[in-house]
Regions:
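N-terminal glycine-/charge-rich "phosphate-binding" loop or analogous flexible N-terminal tail
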Residues: 1-47
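Short loop/helix-cap segments at secondary-structure boundaries that form the rim of catalytic
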Residues: 19-22, 41-44, 57-62, 77-85, ...
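Phosphate/diphosphate ligand-binding glycine-rich loop within oxidoreductases
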Residues: 46-123
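Glycine-rich, N-terminal phosphate-binding loop of Rossmann-like dinucleotide-binding domains
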Residues: 54, 71, 203-204, 230-231, ...
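Oxidoreductase and adenylate-handling cofactor-binding alpha/beta cores
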Residues: 102-118, 161, 296-309
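Glycine-rich NAD(P)-binding loop of Rossmann-like domains
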Residues: 120-153
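Rossmann-like adenosine-cofactor binding region
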Residues: 164, 173-268
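Rossmann-like dinucleotide-binding domain for NAD(H)/NADP(H)
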Residues: 224, 230-321
Length: 321
């Protein structure tokens, strides 16, 4: 097989491309850059390394020895060869999106607590109303589902707002990040939900997290609580969430990820009361830092691959992340 690398990341600048090319050349590889999967797919048959995103790209990379996804989430790859075959190394870009998603979490949390949706409506109606009751992150009980890169960075950013406590929940109940006051295993989530004012969801898309926040668990949250989901849409029962919002049994929610994307035009979720919708943009490659850091992460693992060292962001396909 030719020592060939195919890169399909349209956010890369010439500087990023040169950074990749310099490392590749050091080990005898040539690099071809494409702007779209459609353009790249006919040229993948002899590519040893593929860096990009998408199920169709992964399905076409049948000759690859290493497929690196430019995304952090890998649930869309489950039915592809890169996920199923043991002879293909499969890595992701976990760590590239933490900064931009953590800032998104802070933004929408403040938006919900400070009633910005209501005030936007008031201003559009040309009314001068200044006395809506608002709330603060200060003194709030924050629970974060998932203590990976996203959860840890969210905790560190929210820490500056002086919440009463920040509790992280993961499978093991172990995490040494000092941004958390407490770490609990998933088995304790039912105990913690009634004591949660702000619920941040950073869960990966796996069979284990499917409907993790179902109708039963959603109803355990206090009526004044707000929910933010930046992980995967399958982790929340959207219909149950909408019912709670519409009946004022939950104060507000912000969803960046959904059960079906794009959201169907006739889905009632579009007009749900007290719901802030963003179209899966919390972790896009629209922040320069994200593109820079994502490129650095790929180049780090490219060095590892070429020198026979283990990849740092190898996906555990059994776990789904």
């Amino acid at each position: 097989m030719a020592k060939k690398i195919t890169v399909v990341v349209d956010a890369l600048t010439e500087r990023h491309k040169k950074q990749i090319e310099q490392i590749a050349a050091r080990y005898g590889y040539t690099v071809t850059f494409f702007q779209s999967n459609r353009e790249a797919i006919p040229h993948l048959s002899d590519s040893e390394i593929v860096y990009g995103f998408g199920k169709k790209l992964a399905e076409a990379a049948t000759g690859a020895r290493w497929f690196c996804s430019s995304s952090a989430g890998v649930d869309s790859y489950r039915d592809t060869p890169v996920y199923q075959r043991k002879d293909i190394l499969f890595s992701n870009s976990s760590g590239a999106y933490g900064v931009t998603i953590a800032e998104h979490i802070v933004m929408v949390t403040l938006d919900l607590l400070r009633r910005q949706m209501d005030y936007r409506q008031i201003v559009q109606e040309k009314r001068w109303v200044r006395n809506l009751p608002i709330r603060s992150i200060m003194g709030s009980r924050v629970t974060i589902l998932g203590t990976g890169d996203l959860g840890r960075l969210a905790a560190s950013r929210l820490r500056g707002f002086v919440p009463e406590r920040i509790t992280g929940i993961n499978r093991s109940g172990v995490c040494d990040d000092p941004a958390f006051d407490f770490i609990c295993p998933q088995t304790e989530v039912d105990r913690l939900l009634p004591e949660t004012d702000i619920l941040i969801m950073c869960l990966p898309g796996t069979s284990e997290t499917d409907r993790f926040m179902d109708a039963r668990r959603l109803s355990m949250l206090p009526t004044h609580a707000v929910l933010v989901n930046v992980g995967r849409g399958n982790a929340v029962d959207q219909r149950a969430l909408a019912e709670l919002l519409e009946t004022d049994q939950l104060a507000g929610a912000s969803l960046d990820v959904f059960e079906q994307e794009p959201i169907p035009q006739d889905d009632p979720i579009w007009t749900c009361k007290n719901l802030l919708i963003t179209p899966h943009i919390a972790g896009n490659m629209t922040l320069d830092y994200t593109v820079d850091h994502g490129t650095d992460l790929f180049c780090e693992d490219l060095e590892n691959y070429c020198t026979g060292r283990p990849l740092r962001r190898l996906v555990d396909c059994a776990r789904g992340y």
